[in-house]
Amino acid sequence: MSDEFDIQQAADTLKNWTWAYYREAALKREKAREEAKMLARRLLESDPTLKTVWGFGSVFEESRPFRPDSDIDLAIEGGDIFAAFRLVEGSEFKVDVVDITDCHDEFAERIRAQGVVLGQR
């Protein structure tokens, strides 16, 4: 058995780990998007005063890195934010919900411009 370090073998191993990581992240991103859509439907069904649900952040923005431990970011307009918090608690993902009317104006405009409308009435 040789004690020599095989640089090519190390590079191949690192490449395989990297590809596996990115494959896992891509699958998890898609699963998070589907979960966000389902949560938006449930939010709108459960609260007739809710007007719009947006998804934003790394789950929805391809230009942002997504990690397997990334969370789902949702913004709502109208509705009961506390009821929304309770509803998303059961998700397998960590979910952050913000009331867009309570956000700083620039942040709210960014969500409206770049976010994905997941549901609206």
Predicted regions and their residues:
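Catalytic core of pol beta-like nucleotidyltransferases
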Residues: 1-54, 60-68, 77-121
